[in-house]
UniProtKB/Swiss-Prot annotation:
Protein name (record): Adenine phosphoribosyltransferase
Annotated EC: 2.4.2.7
Gene transcribed to yield this protein: apt
Species this chain originates from: Shewanella sp. (strain W3-18-1)
InterPro entries to which the protein is assigned, alphabetical: Ade_phspho_trans (IPR005764), PRibTrfase_dom (IPR000836), PRTase-like (IPR029057), UPRTase/APRTase (IPR050054)
Coiled-coil regions listed in the entry: none
Function recorded in the entry: Catalyzes a salvage reaction resulting in the formation of AMP, that is energically less costly than de novo synthesis.
Residues in the signal sequence: none
C-alpha cells in the first residue's frame, strides 16, 4: 500500500461498508458507494491519489465501467489530463475495439474508442476495486493495442486473497491501493 497518512487511510477504510451474503451466500461485499456518501472520505481518496500521481507525466486516465469513472474522472480533472471510459459493449458511440475476459461463469467484454489513446499516451488505469484482476487485464490489453503505455493502476479497495494483485503485477503494472481487506 502507499505510504500515506494512517488517519486518512483509516477514514477511507472505515467508510466502506461490508454487506454479508451479497450478491450471494458466503460473499462479503465491500460497498464503495458508502464511501461516496461520505464527502470527507471521498475527497480524501481523490486527494491521496492526486498527491501520489501529480507530476508523474501521465497524459490520460482510463476508468473502467462504472465505478472506475467515479474515481478516475475527478483524478483526471485534478491532474489536468484527459479521462477515457472503458465500457461494456454497445455503450460507446464512436468506433471501438473490444477485449473479452473470463468471469467466474462465462465471459464478458469491454470496449474503448479507437481514437481515445495514442502511441504518445502514458496511461494510468483507475478502478474502485481489485479482486481477480480480469477487468483490468482486459483494459490494459485494450490500451496497449492502441499503442498506449500503461504501467500503473490505482484502486480504492484491494482484495489480495482473490489473486488480482499477482495477476496485474505479472503484466508489469505498479499497483496503488488505498485499503485492503485480507481474508475478511
Amino acid at each position: 500500500m502507499m505510504a500515506m497518512n494512517t488517519e486518512t487511510l483509516s477514514l477511507i477504510k472505515q467508510s466502506i461498508k461490508t454487506i454479508p451474503n451479497y450478491p450471494k451466500e458466503g460473499i462479503l461485499f465491500r460497498d464503495v458507494t458508502s464511501l461516496l456518501e461520505n464527502a470527507a472520505a471521498y475527497k480524501a481518496a481523490i486527494d491521496l491519489l492526486v498527491e501520489h500521481y501529480r507530476g508523474q507525466g501521465f497524459t490520460k486516465i482510463v476508468g473502467t465501467e462504472a465505478r472506475g469513472f467515479l474515481f478516475g474522472a475527478p483524478l483526471a480533472l485534478e491532474l489536468g489530463i484527459g479521462f477515457v471510459p472503458v465500457r461494456k459493449p454497445g455503450k460507446l458511440p464512436r468506433a471501438t475495439i473490444s477485449q473479452s475476459y473470463e468471469l467466474e461463469y462465462g465471459h464478458d467484454s469491454l470496449e474503448i474508442h479507437t481514437d481515445a489513446i495514442s502511441a504518445n499516451d502514458k496511461v494510468l488505469v483507475v478502478d474502485d476495486l481489485l479482486a481477480t484482476g480480469g477487468t483490468i487485464e482486459a483494459t490494459v490489453k485494450l490500451i496497449r493495442q492502441l499503442g498506449g503505455e500503461v504501467k500503473d493502476a490505482a484502486f480504492v479497495i484491494s482484495l489480495p486473497d482473490l489473486g488480482g494483485e499477482a495477476r496485474l503485477t505479472a503484466l508489469g503494472l505498479e499497483l496503488v491501493k488505498l485499503c485492503e481487506f485480507e481474508g475478511e
